[in-house]
Amino acid sequence: MQKKYVVALDQGTTSSRAIVFDHDANIVSVSQREFTQLYPNPGWVEHDPMEIWASQSSVLIESLARAGIHSDAVAAIGITNQRETTIIWEKATGKPVYNAIVWQCRRSAEICEQLKAQGLEDYVRQNTGLLLDPYFSGTKIKWILDNVPDARAKAKRGELLFGTVDTWLLWKLTEGKVHVTDPTNAARTLLFNIHSLSWDSKLLEALDIPAAMLPEVKPSCSVYGTTRIAGEGSEIPLAGIAGDQQAALFGQLCVEQGMAKNTYGTGCFLLMNTGSKAVRSSHGLLTTVAVGAQGEVNYALEGSVFMGGATIQWLRDELGLIRDASDTEYFASKVADTNGVYLVPAFVGLGAPYWDPNARGALFGLTRGANRNHIIRAALESIAYQSKDLLDAMIKDSGVSLKRLKVDGGAVANDFLMQFQADITDVEVLRPSVCETTALGAAFLAGLAVGFWNSVTELEHKACIDTHFKPSINADYRQQLYAGWQDAVARTRS
């Protein structure tokens, strides 16, 4: 049977999805299933690994059935996943010893403080590109080994395996034959040396983690094993893996130095490809691993805006200024500007490049003439200003000028926001036809690995741009607007 399709498994924080793409990178079928979020204690977040697997395997079957596609027509399956989330299971039985500890979980903060007290903070920054923070996998592994009965003894006997979600899915799909991850996921564990591209023995020793638990690291674009869907049909190659943000970067074909993408979700995730050079940030950005045009390791700078779409949710749910997020474009366009109003949405502090956890949200510039439309417009503009803050930091750190910004995520449907993003950053903003860029990245990696597509050059004809947003304001006005934002941020922090 002719191989006509590639399937991307997109395992996210709240749901598991399977998306079927054809040879022209069109979406043929989508299936999605949410799963349970567990909050056993304040600040703790867990998932049931078996529920992750059940939801992911069921949507894989469902996505093909929904489109009437036989599994024999599938050329390959790619995986993209929520990063950092930590699973440990028994090698012999495949049974998890504890729930998955999710990236958002803060329970291992004390372990991070212990590592800082040991003077490891700079070593971690230099060799992993990360900050010593509970966000990453390493301290979560140590917590499980320290707190689950017999876990440490079993680990030392070589009876336990660790994996991020990609590794867990690969293990289950191959019925325990393959224990592998890729560099983009390994780079989020706090245990991976991004320069030598190997597990770091000093950090394993500091966290008392046996190396035998860790998966083998293989390229993001390669064949890891095979699977049969629901035990039927021929063996399908499992052939591409990348963490969600790096998958989106590849899906946008940001495969060369200076290419960047911004994913507009609840927050915003910005990544800039820095090529073969790992750039250490002086602005609090993370240095991480990305995927190059040939599937090779590239490096990237990564930063996140805490309040992106969440700011619009606040307008809707707490202030009642809008009924639906899409209303913001209409109301923002009803006024020529914000009438001097700035919203700094520091509801949970400010992230990079400010790193001020004590900053709090504020509205500035309110006069008697300020109305609802001005506040709504200021909220949208705040997303673009925060993204500019990060992009400027990336440009300063890397010394690379940014020519264009690729965008994806739910908020890119907002033409006003996209145009203002182009105006305030003075770069062209490109919105793709297929906004499912995370899944598309996994599909591209899988398809390239098995020869379904031949090269990134071929993919450039598949990943079509829907809209080009070009800067439309002059430099003086741009500087005036941004100076107002910087002043508002400074006041928020004082």
Swiss-Prot record:
Q: Which SUPFAM superfamilies match?
A: Actin-like ATPase domain
- GO molecular function terms attached to this record: ATP binding; glycerol kinase activity
Q: Could you say which residues bind glycerol here?
A: 83-84, 135, 244-245
Q: Any idea which positions bind ADP?
A: 13, 17, 266, 309, 410, 414
Q: What is its EC number?
A: 2.7.1.30
- Offer a single GO CC term for the protein: cytosol
UniProt xrefs under InterPro entries: ATPase_NBD, Carb_kinase_FGGY, Carb_kinase_FGGY_CS, FGGY_C, FGGY_N, Glycerol_kin
Q: Which UniProt keywords apply?
A: ATP-binding, Glycerol metabolism, Kinase, Nucleotide-binding, Transferase
Biological processes per GO annotation: glycerol catabolic process; glycerol metabolic process; glycerol-3-phosphate metabolic process
Residues given in the record as ATP binding sites: 13-15, 266, 309, 313, 410
**Pathway, per record:** Polyol metabolism; glycerol degradation via glycerol kinase pathway; sn-glycerol 3-phosphate from glycerol: step 1/1
Q: What family is this?
A: Belongs to the FGGY kinase family.
Q: What does this protein do?
A: Key enzyme in the regulation of glycerol uptake and metabolism. Catalyzes the phosphorylation of glycerol to yield sn-glycerol 3-phosphate.
Protein name in the entry: Glycerol kinase
Source organism of this protein record: Shewanella oneidensis (strain ATCC 700550 / JCM 31522 / CIP 106686 / LMG 19005 / NCIMB 14063 / MR-1)
Q: Which gene encodes it?
A: glpK
